[in-house]
Amino acid sequence: MNTLKNKNYYYFCKTLTESIKKNILKYPHINIIYYDNKPNISDENLQAISKFCKKYNIPFFIINNHLLATKMKANGVYLESINRNYKHLSNKKLIIVGSAHNQIEYFIKLRQKCNLIMFSPIFFNQKYSKYKTMGVVKFNLTTRFWKCKAGALGGINQKNLRNLRLINSDNYGVVSLIENKPAL
């Protein structure tokens, strides 16, 4: 982990258990993205995650809901690749992180004024087959001339942690790494 200590990690979560909290605190530059199908301000999990983030000064993002992000005083909003609206552009205080799977979605995220675009899937995981993953070389070639910061997302675990040194990015989405899921 020594060579990757100045990188930014993004963890997607619905709930926080004690083991996940301990793992989160191991990473110095971690950001938490709360995702739920229909998040609302009275959601207990959202309140608990927000409180945890404020206590430990961890940047906090809410998925696809800029109004809720401003009400909860979150640092920003995370826009999924399927989200193609432009309603969030009026709020200048929020950091906007987007997700893309190809160049077309990248250009949509650029128009949405995203500060960071997470490009996925980089490694094999349960959601994508090995034929749909891009790998290190394709990721670097695709994001080489992007006009905004790029992040790697998808399948990052203990098994392929060394490969992150080869990626031309400082931002990674790490779900499997935090939850200690075994490598496939």
Q: Can you say where each PLM-predicted feature lies in the sequence?
A:
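Glycine-rich phosphate-binding active-site loops on the catalytic face of alpha/beta enzymes
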Residues: 77-88, 116-133, 156-184
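Generic hydrophobic/aromatic pocket-lining and core-packing "Φ" positions
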Residues: 20-21, 46, 50, 66, ...
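N-terminal amphipathic alpha-helix/helix-capping segment at the start of soluble metabolic enzymes
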Residues: 1-21
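Alpha-helix-loop-beta-strand connector modules within alpha/beta enzyme cores
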Residues: 46-61, 90-103, 131-153
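Alpha/beta enzyme core
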Residues: 19-31, 67, 82, 106-119
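Catalytic cores of alpha/beta
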Residues: 23, 60-76, 101-113, 144-146, ...
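Hydrophobic faces of well-ordered beta-strands that scaffold small-molecule active sites
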Residues: 7-13, 31-34, 60-62, 77-79, ...
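N-terminal active-site wall of soluble small-molecule enzyme domains
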Residues: 26-92
